[in-house]
Amino acid sequence: MYGSCLLEKEAGMYPGTLMSPGGDGTAGTGGTGGGGSPMPASNFAAAPAFSHYMGYPHMPSMDPHWPSLGVWGSPYSPPREDWSVYPGPSSTMGTVPVNDVTSSPAAFCSTDYSNLGPVGGGTSGSSLPGQAGGSLVPTDAGAAKASSPSRSRHSPYAWMRKTVQVTGKTRTKEKYRVVYTDHQRLELEKEFHCNRYITIQRKSELAVNLGLSERQVKIWFQNRRAKERKMIKKKISQFENSGGSVQSDSDSISPGELPNTFFTTPSAVRGFQPIEIQQVIVSE
């Protein structure tokens, strides 16, 4: 009776370790226990047999930290002998859970690893064939490199090849320079000889007669005055260096004539005659 009570208690505590039907005193490892799943023999050590209790099942020395086996199934992975058919561990499988490995070992077949390329930078490769981390290169990079030589061999622009015909205007940098005809220069020189500063009315008349714009006439007078100042400065510098008569392009000018040539007196002032002032002294 004492032995039957122990059997009932131990059967409730360890449902997966009941005695085999043969009564040989060994733990049920072939699935003959009370609904428990078989446990690997490599994880447990055999317990010594006790002759004091007849029919007492031999309990394996289980780790106290592991939960008892019951209807929950085995928490252990398959034996290592089953892993020999699969390839070795890879850096890409570092984050795969153990439960997924044990539940579906057929997912890790050799064909999945054969198509993977080298993994670069320690990143996990893609699960699809031929999409490894090392082969992630932008597709348009090769096209850009191939198109760069063709860009360098481009022909010059059309306006660079054609010969520009002169139509009265030439281009210097970003501004247009007007090319005046001989008739236009002659009329402008006549007007400049009379008046160095042209009036607004006369400027509009010259623009209409010569076929120019008022802005072009104004710019011509500005340039002509600047040219005259430059010529006068050049003559003065030549006179100071030589110490004698100043030689010009047209004629020679003596030193006594310089004031008359540089500074002309108006015609109205020339008509006046000097007035003689007589002093009258009144005596007492």
Curated annotation (Swiss-Prot):
InterPro entries: Caudal_activation_dom, Caudal_homeobox, HD, HD_metazoa, Homeobox_CS, Homeodomain-like_sf, HTH_motif. The keyword DNA-binding applies. The keyword Signal does not apply. Keywords: Developmental protein, DNA-binding, Homeobox, Nucleus, Transcription, Transcription regulation. SMART domains: HOX. Residues 22-37 have a biased composition (Gly residues). It is found in: Nucleus. Residues 173-232 bind DNA. One of its GO terms (cellular component) is nucleus. Residues 15-40, 120-155, 238-259 are annotated as: Disordered. One of its GO terms (biological process) is embryonic pattern specification. SUPFAM superfamilies: Homeodomain-like. Residues 238-253 have a biased composition (Polar residues). GO terms for molecular function: DNA-binding transcription activator activity, RNA polymerase II-specific; DNA-binding transcription factor activity; DNA-binding transcription factor activity, RNA polymerase II-specific; RNA polymerase II cis-regulatory region sequence-specific DNA binding; RNA polymerase II transcription regulatory region sequence-specific DNA binding; sequence-specific double-stranded DNA binding. Belongs to the Caudal homeobox family. PANTHER family: HOMEOBOX PROTEIN CDX, HOMEOBOX PROTEIN CDX-4. This is Homeobox protein CDX-4.
